[in-house]
From Swiss-Prot:
Annotated 5-methyltetrahydropteroyltri-L-glutamate binding sites: R17, E18, L19, K20, K113, R517, C518, W563, E607
Cofactors that this protein relies on: Zn(2+)
Broad enzyme group: transferase
Protein name stated in the entry: 5-methyltetrahydropteroyltriglutamate--homocysteine methyltransferase
Pathway membership, UniProt: Amino-acid biosynthesis; L-methionine biosynthesis via de novo pathway; L-methionine from L-homocysteine (MetE route): step 1/1
EC number, UniProt record: 2.1.1.14
Organism: Chromobacterium violaceum (strain ATCC 12472 / DSM 30191 / JCM 1249 / CCUG 213 / NBRC 12614 / NCIMB 9131 / NCTC 9757 / MK)
Family, as annotated: Belongs to the vitamin-B12 independent methionine synthase family.
Cofactor: how bound: Binds 1 zinc ion per subunit.
MF (Gene Ontology): 5-methyltetrahydropteroyltriglutamate-homocysteine S-methyltransferase activity; zinc ion binding
Length: 760
């Protein structure tokens, strides 16, 4: 009996973020297109050979992308956004990046979260007359590359229903499903080309099956796949990120050769599929966690797999739960990590070995993997018994919290009056979201400090110089509420995690967020507490430089949770409450230091939502409680801000309002202020700062564009509750474009302020 091992996808960025380096050198015109193409090819080949060497029997092809796999899927079917005027059949590399990053004429495509992960995809744009045509050459070229290396390759495609669903209808209203026949025809041609090129299998991902879908979308699967299965390779329909058991009968009846199930997120769903599982289908068990970094309990997994192997025989395949895109590359490279903690970890490379071990155990018995099982069992018991995991003081503090302790003393209208009396802000106050450009000088100082080449005093002096520069530039621009610029911060989560008990950090545990943007999530391995203040000295120094209010800047508890690799031995709610209390200590210390505007960023609050409606109320209740716990006890005159991005809020606005932040800033420019309709219908009660320009693009907005967005905002939000700000932090931009964009933003804000005064 043999069980094939395969991957749904592999980290694109490389062991040392080679893709990031390639992209950024190309964008700076240090590499030409040929060098970029060759570098990407070499990276793909290195990854395929690594997988082959680790025993992976079917490697994914087409999961690699220069920017985003959803954008690539659009281009495979010839559907570049119409507003750019590009011919998808003759798209240049430069035009590809213009879609993702914008150009002088068109803003970049909208970007949003990939389901409940911290990866961002570019949102497809559909029009009623969108036409599709198969453009298979990129995929065929990569298939040829893999086969030339002797790699057994499995092309990977984002499925047509998911691609269509993930996009937005543009122009006149229409039903996106009206585009499905043309889209399916293009997919048929793609699949036919793959079959003709010798592909035995093709993986088609339909992650939307883990969502609450309307009947019309569900009903579209059977006829679509009836068409797709003709003249195609064997199709493996992949689902992930959640439970699809309610669709078991439908999925088992589809004319595909196999199904992939996420048995990490939803292990119980297997019971809905095993009865009467079709004899002509393989079942791919997503048994190794593709999204977290903890070492697998191999003994327990073998116990779960044994009955599946007995029933299915060779038709049982082994795989990670989802693409390893969401996993860091290689834990073996973490030479500076505590050895005990390192022994608990498995990154992408280690997960390949776990698959190989499980395969050997199923095929040859546990005695064949006795050493691996012993190591796995030891790591599990070592972690369970480790005294570093539990802090009794944290547990006592949580248990002692009185009921209702997360509520502000007074309602928003009273707080707003007291805050205005203290802050004396003009109408339409201008501010930024927090970070300013991380210049080469800043990065060099931080690197030198971490290497011991720069003393603590020297580092503080360098950072204070950058803070003063940021304050002076903001004063010159005329902003009303200033920020210190976060020069001292490497990452909005890592910075805090480095100073909190219960966190650990890797040197190379990077994962892709979007394009060349990578993040290095901290590891929450134990109880969380704040040993000492984290931001107070920097904020106090910044405030000493100016008479204008300076915001204290914190990352919120839900975002720290969502953007970390979280311990799996405690409910996420409890971990989040621990983080909230640690942050509350910081908030109260900031207030005591004279900081009267404190921003608690929660850009990730929506991505924590369960993908299905069941369970969302429970999540939103504890997420809201955690946010309020983090700001509990502050004076009415202290203004609490929060920031959220890449989100659709319509269905969770009551929960957002329940956070009771005095000011919420949101990312809206890429969606042309579409989010504001939701806020208007809901009559959001507190102040709002909708982003007036897109910081993810190097393009500097015109005053006319900013004015148009603010005019839209003023139709929905009363002027006395409207703030003027960019979409997000400015860390990744350069100072010339930042100053130009902010100057335009401040000028438009003042212009509208004068109009309001005249109208009054």
């Amino acid at each position: 009996m043999s069980h094939a091992t395969h991957l749904l996808g592999f980290p694109r960025i490389g062991a040392k973020r080679e893709l990031k380096t390639l992209l950024e050198r190309y964008w700076k015109q240090e590499l030409d297109e040929a060098a970029l193409s060759q570098g990407a090819k070499e990276l793909r080949q290195k990854h395929w050979l690594l997988q082959k060497g680790a025993g992976v029997e079917l490697s994914p092809v087409g999961d690699f992308s220069l920017y985003d796999h959803v954008l690539d899927a659009q281009l495979l079917v010839g559907a570049a956004p119409a507003r750019f005027g590009f011919d998808a059949a003759a798209l240049t590399t430069g035009q590809y990046f213009e879609l993702a990053r914008g150009n002088a004429v068109q803003p970049a495509m909208e970007m949003t979260k990939w389901f409940d992960t911290n990866y961002h995809y570019l949102v497809p744009e559909w029009h009623a007359d969108t036409a599709f045509s198969a453009q298979p050459e990129r995929l065929l070229s990569q298939l040829r590359e893999a086969r030339a290396l002797g790699v057994a390759a499995k092309p990977v495609l984002l499925g047509p229903l998911s691609l269509l669903w993930l996009g937005k209808a543009k122009g006149r209203p229409f039903d996106r499903l009206a585009l499905l026949p043309g889209l399916v025809a293009a997919y048929r041609e793609l699949l036919s080309s793959l079959r003709a090129a010798g592909a035995e299998w093709a993986q088609i991902d339909e992650p939307i099956l883990a969502l609450d879908l309307e009947p019309s979308w569900l009903d579209a699967f059977a006829p679509a796949y009836a068409q797709l299965s003709r003249h195609a390779p064997k199709l493996l329909l992949a689902t992930y990120f959640g439970d699809v058991s309610e669709h078991a009968a439908r999925l088992k009846s589809l004319p595909v050769a196999g199904l992939h199930l996420d048995l990490v997120r939803a292990p119980e769903q297997i019971s809905a599929f095993l009865p009467d599982y079709p004899a002509d289908k393989v079942l791919s068990a997503g048994i190794v966690d593709g999204r977290n970094i903890w070492r697998a309990d191999l003994s327990a997994l073998l116990d779960r797999l044994a009955p599946l192997a007995q029933q299915l025989g060779d038709r049982l395949w082994l795989a990670p739960s989802c693409s390893l895109l969401h996993s860091p590359f290689d834990a073996a490279a973490e030479t500076g990590l505590d050895p005990e903690l390192k022994n608990w970890l498995a990154f992408a490379v280690q997960k390949l070995n776990e698959l190989k071990t499980l395969k050997r155990g199923l095929e040859h018995g546990r005695s064949a993997i006795a050493g691996e099982l012993s190591g796995s069992d030891f790591a599990r018991e070592q972690r369970r018994a480790s005294p570093r995991i539990h802090d009794p003081a944290v547990a006592r503090r949580l248990a002692a919290l009185p009921e209702g302790t997360d509520r502000r003393a007074s309602p928003y209208p009273i707080r707003a009056e007291r805050q205005q009396a203290w802050l004396k802000l003009p109408p339409l106050p201008t501010t930024t979201i927090g970070s300013f450009p991380q210049t080469p000088a800043i990065r060099a100082s931080r690197a030198a400090f971490k290497k011991g080449e720069l003393s603590a005093a020297g580092y503080r002096q360098a950072m204070e110089k950058e803070i003063e520069l940021a304050i002076r530039r903001q004063e010159a621009l005329g902003l009303d509420v200033l920020v210190h610029g976060e020069a001292e911060r490497n990452d909005m989560v890592e910075y805090f995690g480095e100073q909190l008990a219960g966190f650990a950090f890797t040197a190379g545990g990077w994962v892709q967020s979007y394009g060349s943007r990578c993040v290095k999530p901290p590891i929450i391995f134990g109880d969380v507490a704040r040993p000492k203040p984290m931001t107070v000295d920097w904020a106090r120094y910044a405030q000493s430089l100016t008479a204008k209010p300076v915001k204290g800047m914190l990352t919120g508890p839900v975002t720290i949770l969502q953007w970390s690799f979280v311990r799996d031995d405690l409910p996420r709610r409890e971990v989040c409450r621990q983080i909230a209390l640690a942050l509350n200590d910081e908030v109260l210390d900031l207030e005591a230091a004279g900081i009267r505007v404190i921003q608690i960023d929660e850009p990730a609050i929506r991505e924590g939502l369960p993908l299905k409606r069941a369970g969302r109320d429970v999540y939103l209740a504890w997420a809201g409680e955690a946010f309020r716990l983090s700001s509990r006890g502050v004076d009415d005159a202290t203004q609490i801000h929060t920031h959220m991005c890449y989100s659709e809020f319509g269905d969770i606005l009551p929960a957002i309002a329940a956070l009771d932040a005095d000011v919420i800033t949101i990312e809206t420019s890429r969606s042309d202020m579409a989010l504001l309709a939701d806020f208007g219908r809901f009559r959001y009660p507190n102040a709002i700062g909708p982003g007036v320009y897109d910081i993810h693009s190097p393009r500097v907005p015109s005053a006319a564009e900013i004015r148009a967005l603010l005019d839209k905002a003023l139709r929905v939000i009363p002027a006395e509750r409207l703030w003027v700000n960019p979409d997000c932090g400015l860390k990744t931009r350069g100072w010339p474009e930042v100053e130009a964009a902010l100057a335009a933003m401040v000028a438009v804000g003042r212009e509208l302020r004068e109009k309001l005064a005249q109208a009054a």
